[in-house]
Amino acid sequence: MATRQSKTAKRNKTQNQKRNVESEVFTDSAARNLLENQPKLTPKSKVKKPSKLAVKKQQAKVRLYGAKNGREYKESELQIPVLNKAVVPGVKAKKGKKGKVFVDDNDNLTMERLVKSINDKYDKVNESKLEKSRRLEEIREVKRREMEKKEEQKKNKLDDKKKELKNKASVARANRRKNAKEAAKEAESDEPRKKKVSFA
């Protein structure tokens, strides 16, 4: 059985209503006409909002299988504006792909190593342990020869530089000696010569 309300409660219920603020667009016809003529300032979103059912399905999948990791973007893709850097005068930064090493055409060792290592990665061959160890040994041998070749090249380069420096030093020494001789000759020529008399 419902409880009876007092008269004051009934009065309060009817009197204390919320004020409704109506926009003049609905009451004033002129304002409504002005609003109709306004261009649509905000363009419609091209992305369609998923329905409630689709959202529920997606959430159920997330609960079952876990959320997919979103794609990670690189800094270059995000188009972040580059802050002002200190520019070193006279130094030009290299452009182009970094870490790109070109192999010489006549560098057979590097080519051989690359071919063998690529085959090692991508050839799914059922081979015995002996064959596999032999193949790995070949790759190691090629790498070792390549390292030896690089060391030899370094040594040759260093020797060439030493020779060049020695040659420069010897040329400079020869020039200094030549200049000293010329200076001595000039000094002798500047002094007054004494007359010499020879008796027969």
Swiss-Prot record:
InterPro entries: Loc1
Locations listed in the record: Nucleus, Nucleolus
Keyword Transport: yes
Regions of compositional bias (Basic residues) in chain numbering: 43-58
UniProt feature coiled coil, ranges: 121-191
Any GO BP annotation: intracellular mRNA localization
Gene Ontology terms: cellular component: nucleolus; preribosome, large subunit precursor
Keywords attached to this entry: Coiled coil, mRNA transport, Nucleus, Ribosome biogenesis, Transport
Compositional bias per record (Basic and acidic residues), positions renumbered to this chain: 143-167, 180-193
Location of the region described as Disordered in the Swiss-Prot/TrEMBL record: 1-58, 143-200
Source domain of life: Eukaryota
GO MF: mRNA binding
Record text on subunit structure and interactions: Component of the 66S pre-ribosomal particle.
Family assignment from sequence similarity: Belongs to the LOC1 family.
Function of the protein: Required for efficient assembly and nuclear export of the 60S ribosomal subunit.
Protein name: 60S ribosomal subunit assembly/export protein LOC1
